[in-house]
Curated annotation (Swiss-Prot):
Main location: virion
Protein's gene: L1
Region (Disordered): 474-505
A Pfam family assignment: Late_protein_L1
Any one GO biological process: endocytosis involved in viral entry into host cell
Entry-linked Gene3D superfamilies: Major capsid L1 (late) superfamily, Papillomavirus
UniProt entry tagged with the keyword Disulfide bond: yes
Protein name: Major capsid protein L1
Organism of provenance: Human papillomavirus 7
Length: 505
């Protein structure tokens, strides 16, 4: 008896899958190098929250040592450079791009540990060295608790923004069956890391504003924020490798204290996991345990900043090419998170004797950065294959280079009116061309403009001298020695020509 073959037949894709290649395959590097550096970059604000005016405008921003600093570095268009060597590239078929070969992130300010806390922190019992079992918390048992955070140093370099991940509120399959007080549904989300986003402080990468309704389970700077962790897996798997040329990180943490939470335990401990007690242990104590983090010792021996970093080979397919004439540098440094305590007297002169009510205390946190780069000039030959590849990666690049890929021929019949100024017909005026939109305009970055900061005199800058030394390159002497020319017969009228010595043969 004939039977239908139930094995599935897999058909090949209708179009061939494009192969992702390294930028080294179509980018030719030149021998021209440039240095570019920022000015001293400073920011200062309140370490826990932003201060607002009565109309809602921000008067003092939130500036914490546990925030991401995402610098969007703007580079000049190399195709508009006035190069002395006109034979370097053909403007008809080639375009110039920058390749980042060196970077140094400078950090100012002394090493220090900043702490954070909450005046209404959800701390019930000390479960590390408990002396009393299962005290029943009152209606409000929150306490004033402070702690230091996990220690993190991080530097990510790419030509597109970095991606972060966190646990957020998910959508349940049947929303109608969700009751108040049910455990929220979790979903792993990936988003662009923006300047000012909070790092993982030791309480996990999550949306605290959505997942902690009491606003008391974490310190003030986290309770209404989203803590993001770099999505290293996602950025490493990116086909073109634009968001992550390389990264350096150093993380450390240990647990300082062990507590449990006050409140009704949502997931009760199963009865088969314990034997019922008696007396003051008849009711089982709370089992929502948690720990307070600590980053431990801060030392200059473990610093990853204030050092030159050289890009020989990127981990992805993009080997340091700055497409779009921009670079994104993401920095985290919690080893300089000291919070400054300021005090102002409410009366003048300073009141005596001392009275606490006559002084106001304030908190501020300041940060200092300096960015230095070494860029190499590169050439891309735009043949049909390369243009198709770049168009698939980012179609806006060809528009920036004044290359257009024509639309396919239309088979429909189009209308063309004879009299364009005829009031009897609809307006035939062409719509004005749309301005190019910034694909990252909805994100917040620290803008750093280096369009007028490029210099080919590498030996005039600290990072440039380091690059020349490690590359084995030497610059010519700045001052040429001037020797006195030898006298000639016409230089002095009284000169005597020496006689030629005779030799015997």
């Amino acid at each position: 008896m004939w039977q239908l073959n139930e094995n599935q037949v897999y058909l090949p894709p209708p179009t061939p899958v494009a192969t992702i290649v390294s930028t080294d395959e179509y980018v030719q590097r030149t021998s021209l190098y440039y240095h570019a550096g920022s000015t001293r970059l400073l920011t200062i604000g309140h370490p826990y929250f932003e201060l607002k005016k009565p109309n809602g405008d921000v008067s003092v921003p939130k500036v914490s040592g546990h925030q991401y600093r995402v610098f969007r570095v703007r580079l000049p268009d190399p195709n508009k450079f006035g190069l002395s060597d006109t034979s370097l590239f053909n403007s008809e078929t080639q375009r110039l791009v920058w390749a980042c070969v060196g970077v140094e992130v400078g950090r100012g300010q002394p090493l220090g540990v900043g702490i954070s806390g909450h005046p209404y922190f959800n701390k019930d019992e000390d479960v590390e060295n408990s002396s009393v079992y299962g005290t029943v918390p009152g209606q409000d048992s929150r306490e004033n608790v402070a702690m230091d955070y996990k220690q993190t140093q991080l530097c990510i370099v790419g030509c597109t923004p970095p991606i972060g991940e966190y646990w957020g509120m998910g959508t349940p399959c049947n929303a109608s069956k969700v009751s108040p007080g049910d455990c929220p549904v979790l979903e792993l989300k990936s988003e662009v890391i923006e300047d000012g986003d909070m790092v993982d402080a030791g309480f996990g990468a999550m949306d605290f504003a959505s997942l902690q309704a009491n606003k008391s389970d974490v310190p003030l700077d986290l309770c209404t924020s989203i803590s993001k962790y770099p999505d290293y897996l996602g950025m490493a798997a990116e086909p073109y490798g634009n968001s992550l040329f390389f990264f350096l990180r150093r993380e450390q943490m240990f647990v300082r204290h062990f507590f449990n939470r006050a409140g009704t335990t949502g997931d009760s401990v199963p009865n088969d996991l314990y034997i019922t007690g008696s007396s003051n242990r008849a009711s089982i104590a709370g089992s929502i345990y948690y720990s307070t983090p600590s980053g431990s010792l801060v030392t200059s021996d473990s610093q990853i900043f204030n050092k030159p970093l050289w890009i020989q080979k990127a981990q992805g397919h993009n080997n340091g090419i700055c497409f779009g004439n921009q670079l994104f540098v993401t920095v985290v440094d919690t080893t300089r998170s000291t919070n400054l305590t300021l005090c102002a007297a409410t009366q003048s002169p300073t009141p005596t004797p001392y009275d606490n009510s006559k002084f106001k205390e304030y908190l501020r946190h300041g940060e200092e950065f300096d960015l230095q780069f070494i860029f190499q000039l590169c050439v891309i030959t735009l043949n049909a294959e390369v243009m198709t590849y770049i168009h698939a990666m980012d179609s806006s690049l060809l528009d920036d280079w004044n290359f257009k890929i024509g639309p396919p021929a239309s088979a429909t019949l189009e209308d063309t009116y004879r009299f364009l100024t005829n009031k009897a017909i609809a307006c035939q005026r062409d719509a004005p061309p749309k301005e190019k939109e910034d694909p990252y305009k909805k994100y917040k970055f620290w803008e750093v403009n280096l369009t007028e900061k490029f210099s080919s005199q590498l030996d005039q800058f600290p990072l440039g001298r380091k690059f020349l030394m490690q590359a084995g390159l030497r610059t010519g002497p700045k001052f040429k020695s001037r020797k006195r020319p030898a006298p000639t017969s016409s230089s002095s009228s009284g000169s005597v020509t020496p006689k030629r010595k005779k030799t015997k043969r």
